[in-house]
Amino acid sequence: APGAGVDLSRIPGMSEHAYLMRTVGDAMKLRAAIISRMEEANLITKHQQRKEMLSFVVVGGGYSGVETAGQIQDLIAGVRRYYDNIREDEATVTLIHSGDRLLSMLGERLGDYTGRCLEKMGVKIVFNKRVRAVTARTVQLSDGTTIPTNLVVRASS
């Protein structure tokens, strides 16, 4: 599978700035971090600053990455009503995958279907790009694109 065996911890900044998604404990820490970002963003008055605070990036288009991106999107949708100052378009979840199809090990139809479902939920998917570096506020991709973000999840090996 594309990306299989890639050691994401060797990407500059990944170990320092990204949340790991492997255990239930990791999931609980991630949930708390997302809620914390929502709380903080609700106090920010400037739209662009709220958008940057609420930009979440998931790296990895396998089982864990797909599930994590969908769950983050669901969590945001479920709690947004408690935050009067956060508009629907301000929170974004971006899934970055080095291959051309999600869940490639399951075949073309299921991978494409999964991608359509995530996009319908509001998850933005970036295909055929690798993460080159992660900082506290950005993810830099192999094509030179920089994605502003406040939280990165490493949902791959």
Regions inferred by a protein language model and the residue ranges of each:
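Glycine-rich loop/hinge motif
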Residues: 69
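FAD-binding core/adjacent interface of flavoenzyme oxidoreductases
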Residues: 1-57, 75, 153
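A Rossmann-like FAD-binding core segment of flavoenzymes
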Residues: 73-157
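Alpha-helical hydrophobic/aromatic positions enriched in membrane-embedded helices and signal peptides
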Residues: 14-15, 59, 120, 142
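Glycine-rich Rossmann-fold phosphate-binding loop(s) that bind the pyrophosphate
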Residues: 59-62, 99
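N-terminal Rossmann-fold NAD(P) dinucleotide-binding loop
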Residues: 65-66
